[in-house]
């Protein structure tokens, strides 16, 4: 690849691992440019500060290490769950929802440092390249994006290690070191596993793969109950204790994981065209989704709830495919957020051997009317004779069709 002399400074999404450490040196050599590294703490459970020393050893002068955990949950995870979002009926979008925040921060740092370009370590086969770059172009249309995995001739871990040896790149790997058989990605919402034996969709994942949860079979024999308090669609307290968004998710991850909640094994349709198998642990998100639907069940108008449900698959697709910063996602978000005004109250859930069961819900904004819903004497609150006219009017079009000879059988 020829160098581009117009690029003087590049902001790299930097983990401190093998791939992105190689990318730092490759950018320096290929573009003869200055590299700014950006490392985000979004709850991946690893120390991010060591990335500073690694970047310094590679000659990086401008190093950003940002704690984005609260922003991630407050501005991305919670808004997503207000829509009860799942992709293809199962996936809670743990990886997808983290990418818009990283893209935004890359652009902010590019603006702050006067960088000409941004770079990432996503491969040319996956969805993340699309998510990062769609976000970047939406937020800064003229930005250059450098995706080394689409350009260089380093095609394996072995060639990366050879590159490190040749260029004296300090990494915490050796050729002899045993590598995890899985490609993993983690943040406060989930941890994902791909590759290895999972590339055979018939092979069951090994038990020692799972890191956030016990197996449902080994979970406690006694259930645990949680009381979750909602305000405008977001959880603000657990068992009466007010918490920040990130603390809510951290707490639910621990409590749910201890009971084997949130494991998922799916084959999903990637935006780039292929099918991919992944395993996920999303204990906190699984609890939030179940509880949020429960509080909406008593606080939302029926037609509002049904309309939200009809829009949700498209909203989920937007997030999965990388269109968080699109006008259509923002339009839907405005409608979704507007619906959450009355979504206040408490939900009681039971965690037991991999399951989340809603066992109670209450709200001062509840539309549930016991006097009308009762099977006992409703004291005239509901006139059952009214149902006859309701049924006949709704049957009218079908009766006319039958009278005109339309055959159904």
From Swiss-Prot:
The residues that the entry says bind L-aspartate are 123, 127-128
Residues involved in ATP binding: 13-21, 40, 121
Pfam families, alphabetically?
A: Arginosuc_syn_C, Arginosuc_synth
The yes or no answer to whether the keyword Cytoplasm is present is yes
Upper lineage is: Bacteria, Pseudomonadati, Pseudomonadota, Gammaproteobacteria, Cellvibrionales
Q: Which organism is it from?
A: Saccharophagus degradans (strain 2-40 / ATCC 43961 / DSM 17024)
Select a single GO molecular function from the record's annotations and give it: argininosuccinate synthase activity
Q: Name one GO cellular component term.
A: cytoplasm
* Residues reported in the UniProt entry to bind L-citrulline: 91, 96, 127, 131, 183, 192, 268, 280
| Keyword Nucleotide-binding part of the UniProt annotation | yes
Enzyme class, first EC level, given as a word:
ligase
Which reaction does this chain catalyze?
L-citrulline + L-aspartate + ATP = 2-(N(omega)-L-arginino)succinate + AMP + diphosphate + H(+)
Q: What is this protein called?
A: Argininosuccinate synthase
CDD domains recorded: ASS
Q: Its Gene Ontology biological processes?
A: argininosuccinate metabolic process; L-arginine biosynthetic process; urea cycle
What pathway does this protein act in? Amino-acid biosynthesis; L-arginine biosynthesis; L-arginine from L-ornithine and carbamoyl phosphate: step 2/3
User: Where in or outside the cell is it found?
Assistant: Cytoplasm
- EC number per UniProt: 6.3.4.5
What are the UniProt keywords, alphabetically? Amino-acid biosynthesis, Arginine biosynthesis, ATP-binding, Cytoplasm, Ligase, Nucleotide-binding
Give the family per the record: Belongs to the argininosuccinate synthase family. Type 1 subfamily.
User: Oligomeric state and partners?
Assistant: Homotetramer.
Q: Which domain of life is it from?
A: Bacteria
NCBIfam families, per this entry? argG, PRK00509.1
């Amino acid at each position: 690849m020829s160098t581009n002399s117009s690029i003087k400074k590049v902001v790299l999404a930097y983990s401190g691992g093998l791939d992105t450490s190689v990318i730092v040196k490759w950018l320096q050599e290929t573009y003869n440019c200055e590299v700014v590294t950006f490392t985000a703490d979004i709850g991946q459970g690893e120390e991010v500060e060591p990335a500073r020393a690694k970047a310094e050893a590679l000659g990086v002068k401008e190093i950003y290490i940002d704690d984005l955990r609260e922003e991630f949950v407050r501005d991305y995870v919670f808004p997503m769950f207000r829509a009860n979002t799942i992709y293809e009926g199962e996936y809670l979008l743990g990886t997808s929802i983290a990418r818009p925040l990283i893209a935004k921060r890359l652009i902010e740092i590019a603006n702050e440092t006067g960088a000409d370009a941004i770079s990432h370590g996503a491969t040319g086969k996956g969805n993340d390249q699309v998510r990062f770059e769609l976000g970047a172009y939406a937020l800064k249309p003229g930005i250059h994006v450098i995706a080394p995995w689409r350009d260089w001739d380093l095609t394996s871990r072995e060639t990366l290690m050879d590159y490190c040896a040749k260029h004296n790149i300090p990494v915490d790997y050796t050729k002899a070191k045993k590598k995890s058989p899985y490609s993993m990605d983690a943040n406060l919402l989930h941890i994902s596993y791909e590759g290895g034996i999972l590339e055979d969709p018939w092979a069951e994942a090994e038990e020692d793969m799972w890191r956030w949860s016990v197996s449902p079979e080994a979970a406690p024999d006694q259930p645990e109950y949680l009381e979750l308090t909602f305000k405008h669609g977001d959880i603000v307290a657990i068992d009466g204790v007010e918490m920040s968004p990130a603390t809510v998710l951290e707490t639910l991850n621990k409590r749910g994981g201890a009971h084997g909640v949130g494991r998922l094994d799916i084959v999903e349709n990637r935006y780039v065209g292929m099918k991919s198998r992944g395993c996920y642990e999303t204990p906190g998100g699984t609890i939030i989704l179940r509880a949020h639907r429960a509080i909406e069940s008593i606080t939302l108008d029926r037609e509002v709830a049904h309309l939200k449900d009809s829009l949700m698959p498209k909203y989920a697709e937007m997030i999965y495919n990388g269109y968080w910063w699109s006008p259509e996602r923002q339009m839907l978000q405005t409608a979704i957020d507007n619906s959450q005004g009355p979504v206040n109250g408490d939900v009681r859930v039971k965690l037991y051997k991999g399951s989340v069961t809603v066992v109670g819900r209450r709200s001062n904004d509840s539309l549930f009317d016991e006097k009308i819903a009762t099977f006992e004497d409703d004291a005239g609150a509901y006139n059952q004779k009214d149902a006859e006219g309701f049924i006949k009017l709704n049957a009218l079009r079908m009766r006319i069709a039958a009278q005109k000879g339309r055959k159904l059988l």
